[in-house]
Amino acid sequence: MAQRMTTQLLLLLVWVAVVGEAQTRIAWARTELLNVCMNAKHHKEKPGPEDKLHEQCRPWRKNACCSTNTSQEAHKDVSYLYRFNWNHCGEMAPACKRHFIQDTCLYECSPNLGPWIQQVDQSWRKERVLNVPLCKEDCEQWWEDCRTSYTCKSNWHKGWNWTSGFNKCAVGAACQPFHFYFPTPTVLCNEIWTHSYKVSNYSRGSGRCIQMWFDPAQGNPNEEVARFYAAAMSGAGPWAAWPFLLSLALMLLWLLS
């Protein structure tokens, strides 16, 4: 009798530990990976409403990591944000430039990139994003709209001549059509910002990839995406039901013992 009670007590303790661990992981995912801002050059400490966000950054106005001023600067050539010159190989086509503006808005404003934030040791930022699963249609359209524009590099994070205060092509770096340096949409989106993005096989609306473009009237679809990946990273995603199944098995053992 005493042995049976000891066994039952041990089973109960195991059940409590398992369920407790699962709840801890879920809580960690919610606080550390969701609704957060990067520790970077222009980001706010915490996301919040910004009613006057400018033009292409407006989809994030209900909950943003960027200020109104940052959103305005995101639309300018050689803005104070990073002194980056989109027209380094002649005038960039407006259809192409709008993708880079949207890319900047997503980077500066989105509070839904937590699952992909990584620490870095750089003078201008302490954190970056890595391998954000960008919806394939957003990447394909970006590449298509930039086919007629020119550039001189495949990695825009490094290798520029900054002596004039903004980026210019390095000596010997020839200006070529985008498709010369970016032969496919995947190369463009994965390589241009040193793997900040990783093109997803999922489509817009799937809940499994980050949308650069969305209609705020329909809500922010990237919130669901962030929750999915945060849960998966915390070990509480598709396996969230296993504590219950284990507890059920333990209870059966208890009854049969």
UniProtKB/Swiss-Prot annotation:
Known tissue expression: Primarily expressed in tissues of epithelial origin. Expression is increased in malignant tissues. Expressed in kidney, lung and cerebellum. Detected in placenta and thymus epithelium.
GO BP term, example: neural crest cell migration involved in heart formation
Entry binding sites for folate: D103, Y107, W124, R125, K126, E127, R128, H157, K158, G159, W160, N161, W162, S196
Lipidation positions, renumbered (GPI-anchor amidated serine): S234
Location within or outside the cell: Cell membrane; Apical cell membrane; Basolateral cell membrane; Secreted
Chain coiled-coil ranges: none
Keyword Plastid: no
Membrane topology of this protein: Lipid-anchor; GPI-anchor; GPI-like-anchor
Superkingdom per UniProt: Eukaryota
Mutagenesis or variant effect for R125A: Moderately reduced affinity for folate
Residues cleaved off as propeptide: 235-257
Glycosylation sites: N69, N161, N201
Family from the record: Belongs to the folate receptor family.
Function: Binds to folate and reduced folic acid derivatives and mediates delivery of 5-methyltetrahydrofolate and folate analogs into the interior of cells. Has high affinity for folate and folic acid analogs at neutral pH. Exposure to slightly acidic pH after receptor endocytosis triggers a conformation change that strongly reduces its affinity for folates and mediates their release. Required for normal embryonic development and normal cell proliferation.
Disease linkage: Neurodegeneration due to cerebral folate transport deficiency: An autosomal recessive neurodegenerative disorder resulting from brain-specific folate deficiency early in life. Onset is apparent in late infancy with severe developmental regression, movement disturbances, epilepsy and leukodystrophy.
Protein's name in the database: Folate receptor alpha
Annotated organism of origin: Homo sapiens
